[in-house]
Amino acid sequence: MNFSLLFSADVTDRFDRVFWFGDFNFRIQKSRESVDRIMKRHARDQQTIIRELLLHDQLNEVFDRGKIFHGFKENEITFMPTYKFDVNTDVYDSSPKKRVPSWTVK
């Protein structure tokens, strides 16, 4: 065992796998109307919706520019945005705020 790695400040040297958890509060950089159009246009193909929305995901943008999570990669996102639904429904926010569907807790 290489004990110098055990005390390294770089967690990628110290562990085989690292999991980041939390509400990072990154959003999709599109208007609610634009996101709704994308979802309607590709209603029969969720993976196309996901791919198109991820092009505008704030976390992906700063990650791709090398601003955060150096040395890490994110697994492929294969699920629809999880934020924000009306309570006890699968309907995205219909309140006056009309929050943009996003992956705020990936």
Question: Where does each model-flagged region fall?
Answer:
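Catalytic lobes of large eukaryotic enzymes
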Residues: 1-106
